[in-house]
Structures are given as C-alpha cells and as structure tokens.
C-alpha cells in the first residue's frame, strides 16, 4: 500500500542563534504553509500444512503442523527539503555548529521525517495439533489437542542501515495444559550480534565471534 499525506498549517517557526545571549531564538510565523509526505509498504504471506499420520490404532494418531510465513517491506523517504539550518557559534568564536530544524516543528499534525528508512520484516507463526485416541472406548472421533497454540518468530532487516542491520529475533509462544485449565506463555529475544569486552553490541555476528548462532538477550 502507498500512503500520501498533505499537511496544511497557518503556524510555522523560524530559528536563529543569538550570539549575545548565546541562546536559540524561535520566531513564530503566521501564514499558510504546507508539506507533503508519503511512504510505501507491502506484505505477502502463505500457509503451509504438514501432517504426520501414525495410524488410527496408535495412541497419538496424527500430528498437524501449520506454518504461516510472511515477509513485508516498508520504505519511508527522507523529507529533508523541509529542513533548514542555523549556525551556533561558540563563546570564543572558534567553532561553528550547524543545527538542523524544520519550520513545521510545532505543527498540529507533527513534522516531516528527516531520516530515510527501508526495512524488510520476516515472521513465522506455527501451531501444532495432535489427534489422540479418546480414553472413552465408545467414542467414535479422535480427540484434538493443541500441543502448541502458537510459536512465533519475527525479525527485521534494516536495508538503509550501515551496521547492525538485523534486529533481534523475537520469539513468543503459548500452550495449554491440564485439559485447558492452565495456560503457559513464554518469550525470548535472540540477538545475532556479539558483545565486546564492555558488553557493547558490535557489528560482528555472534557465531563469527566464537559463540552460538544467537545470543539470548532476554527471556
């Protein structure tokens, strides 16, 4: 899908730097102004069924595995045409910094983004269901039991990033025990990147640093 927004406002601002007071000066401006933003996203998914049949004479007659993989893509352009700069001069006059701002900062509908982003999302949802021979010998139908109500994995790849492009893999799941009287949920975050000696994430895969494929960062 593609989204386009036209934003109109009658209140904008101008920013300058006062060297005497060494402070930012914000001047409100009245009058019609506008900016436009747009983005694009798309996704596709499917459902895959797997059946393992053990025979009607077995206690567990069959197990069905349902997988729902999906992939998505999002892109948000940088609208830096709506940004300006002002100079901040140090007290000794030796250094000058450029500060970016947009005149739409105080707009009722927010301001246009300045950072380009592009990412691919991956997810996989699973559930496992078993057909079990009923203890009641008079029953004609097998009993259906969920072994796993859900087992989900998701991650993102930052196409626009210059490092640490993969986000951590988020794992979540749940099942029910004791004839659906007890619900059990679990989750974990698995990071593909290694840590340095200061426990700071670095742009090196954990497996290339002598570790496992993923590093458990939370559970």
Tell me what each language-model feature is.
Residues 1-219:
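Outer-membrane beta-barrel translocator/pore domains, especially the C-terminal barrels
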């Amino acid at each position: 899908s593609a989204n386009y927004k036209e934003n109109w406002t009658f209140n904008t601002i101008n920013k300058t730097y006062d060297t005497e007071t060494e402070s930012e000066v914000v001047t409100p401006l009245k009058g019609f102004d506008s900016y436009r933003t747009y983005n694009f996203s798309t996704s596709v998914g499917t459902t895959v069924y797997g059946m393992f049949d053990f025979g009607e004479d077995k206690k567990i007659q069959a197990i069905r595995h349902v997988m729902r993989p999906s992939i998505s893509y999002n892109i948000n352009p940088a609208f830096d045409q709506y940004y300006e700069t002002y100079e901040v001069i140090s007290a000794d006059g030796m250094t000058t910094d450029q500060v970016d701002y947009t005149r739409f900062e105080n707009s009722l509908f927010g301001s246009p983004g300045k950072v380009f982003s592009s990412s691919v999302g991956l997810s996989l949802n699973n559930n496992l269901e078993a057909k079990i021979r009923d203890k009641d010998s008079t029953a004609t139908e097998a009993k259906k039991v969920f072994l796993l109500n859900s087992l989900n994995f998701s991650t993102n790849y930052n196409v626009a990033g210059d490092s640490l492009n993969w986000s951590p893999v988020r794992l979540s799941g749940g099942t029910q025990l004791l004839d659906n009287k007890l619900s059990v949920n679990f989750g974990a975050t698995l990071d593909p990147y290694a840590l340095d000696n200061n426990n700071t994430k670095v742009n090196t895969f954990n497996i290339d640093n002598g570790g496992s494929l993923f590093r458990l960062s939370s559970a």
